[in-house]
């Protein structure tokens, strides 16, 4: 987010998009918030853009998080960008298109933007802990998405270890508690 990050101090204004300087095409891999924004900005500059998404829907983890109680407004991040992308003739969108390095090389573009997201750690390493929690290999450990999607498989109390101390752990705890799953909430 150039406005929030104060990139404007270096002359990077998100409202004043400079036109393209070359006729090269661009490939954006991944359609989470960063991939969508990258695609929109490149297209606004006039580039021919190909957006490749491994899943059948655009939006990445925002689709998951916006489905949780209290976070539905977050979907506008996806909706607004997807709407603009679908209106532009200089953007091609390919869903269900998981690309390997070989695929990307075969594509023949010089400008490649990887916006493939990240994965949750399941070893206990986080903001305050720099070493894995011993013994986790002997118990079932879920990511936030896995806990929500597989809640019927959860037997007994579930410990939510919140080392980020942000919004998501509390929202996941509330969601699971509403599904009658006993939650023990731990913050370091």
Predicted regions and their residues:
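C-terminal catalytic ATP-binding subdomain
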Residues: 1-5, 85, 111
């Amino acid at each position: 987010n150039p406005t929030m990050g104060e990139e404007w101090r270096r002359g990077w204004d998100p409202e004043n998009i400079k036109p393209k300087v070359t006729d090269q095409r661009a490939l954006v891999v991944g359609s989470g918030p960063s991939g969508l924004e990258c695609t929109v900005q490149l297209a606004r500059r006039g580039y021919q853009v190909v957006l490749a998404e491994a899943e059948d829907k655009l939006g990445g983890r925002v689709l998951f998080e916006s489905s949780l109680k209290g976070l539905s407004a977050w979907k506008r991040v996806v909706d607004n960008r997807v709407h603009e992308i679908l209106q532009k003739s200089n953007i091609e969108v390919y869903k269900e298109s998981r690309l390997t390095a070989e695929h990307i090389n075969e594509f023949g573009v010089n400008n490649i933007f990887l916006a493939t997201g990240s994965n949750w750690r399941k070893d206990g390493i986080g903001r305050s802990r720099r070493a894995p929690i011993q013994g986790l290999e002997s118990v079932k450990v879920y990511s936030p998405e896995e806990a929500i999607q597989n809640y019927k498989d959860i037997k007994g109390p579930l410990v939510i270890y919140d080392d980020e101390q942000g919004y998501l752990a509390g929202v996941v705890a509330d969601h699971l508690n509403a599904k009658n799953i006993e939650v023990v909430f731990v913050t370091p």
